[in-house]
Amino acid sequence: LFERCGGCTLQYMDQPSLLAWKTGLVSHALEKAGFDIPQDITSFQVPPNSRRRADLAVRRTEQGIVIGLHAKGSQDVTDMTSCAVLHPAIVSSLPALRTTLRTLNAVHKTADLHINLLDSGLDILLSTDSPLIATDRQRLTALAEELDIPRISWQRLKAATPYETAVQRAPVYQTIAGHQLTPPPGAFLQATAQSETAIQQAVLDALPARLGKRASLIELYAGCGTLSLPLGDRCQVQAYEGYEPALAALKSVGKSRVTSVCRDLNRQPIMGKDLGKADVVVLDPPHAGAKLQMRQIALGKPDYVIYVSCNPAALSNDASQLAQAGYRLETVSVIDQFLWSPETEAVCRFKRESSRRSRNALSH
C-alpha cells in the first residue's frame, strides 16, 4: 500500500532520521529568510497511528466503493485497507463506510469524506456529487448506530450551499485547553492530540517571560481556539478568524479574557497601525502562508511575533518580511505531526531589534 498511496512518501525513513531531516528543512527555510539559527532547537514527533483527522476521496467503481488517498502522481484513489498514520478508530470505520456509501444514491461517481476523531467519537462530513434522498438518510442513520457516531453531516460537492446535519444521535464535543466546545463539521484541528499539546506548549513557552496585566496579544487565524484558549489563561487575547462556524465554537466557551472577531484576513488583513499597539502577535496561517498579513505586521512592528507554520516554504517567504523589518529569530520548535510526509510544523519567536517602545505592559 505504501508504494501506491500518495500520503506517506517518506516511509522508508526511520523516525529519528525523519525528525532530523525536518528540523533541517525548517532551519534552511529560516536561513533563506535571512536569520541566524538558534543553537537550541526543540523538537517533538508524534507516534504512529495517532492522526485524528482524515480527508479521504471516494470513488464508485465496477467493483464497489473505493475510499482512500490519491495514488502518487495520479487522480486514481488507492483503497485504504490499512494505515500506519491514522488512528485505528478511523481505519476500523472504513469497511462499514464502504458498505454504506455503496448503497447511497447521493454517491453517483465521486465523493469526499472528512473524518475528525473528537472526544465524543467520529464526526463525519460527507460531500457527494448527487443530492441526498430520504433513503440515503435512513442508511446513514443505520451507519451511525452501527459505529456509534454522534453526528454525520452532508453537503453537495463544489456547491455554494453550506453543510446540513444528516444524522444527530448524541452531543458532539471536543476539549481544548480544558474547555469543552462543539467544532463545526469538517473543522480544522491539529493532526493529533499529542501535537496539539506540543504546539500549545511551544507557543506558551515563546511568550515573553513576564506578561503583565496591561499586555495585549493579537491572535490571527484563531480557528476554534486551539491557541486562543490557553493564551487566554496568560493574558488578554484579541482573536481573529475568517470562518464563522469555527469562531462560533470559540465564542461558545465564553472565556472572558478572549474576545473574538470574524474577519477574512486574506482579503482584509489587520492593519499595521493596529498590530503595532500589541505587545505580542501570534499567527497560525493556512498552508499558503500570510503574505498580505505579514506585510502589515512588518509595518506595525509589534515587539514580538510568534509564528506557527505548517509549511517551511511559506514560513521562509513570510519570515523574510520580518528579517527586512529588523526582527531577530530567538526560538524555534519543530513538531513533526505529519509522519512520513514532507510537511512539518514549526513554532518560531521573532523579536524586534532596538525596540524603544515602553515594555511596562510586559512587566507590570
Mark where each language-model region is.
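Extended interfacial segments that mediate partner engagement and assembly in macromolecular machines
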Residues: F2-T110
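A short glycine-rich, hydrophobically flanked beta-strand micro-motif that places a catalytic Asp/Glu
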Residues: D40, H108-L117, I152-S153
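Nucleotide donor/acceptor-binding cores
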Residues: R52, L122, R214-A215
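Short beta-strand micro-motifs enriched in acidic
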Residues: A57-T61, N116-L118, K351-E353
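A short interface-forming secondary-structure element
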Residues: C83, L125-A134
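Carbohydrate-binding surface patches
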Residues: I115-D129
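Rossmann-like S-adenosyl-L-methionine
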Residues: P131-H364
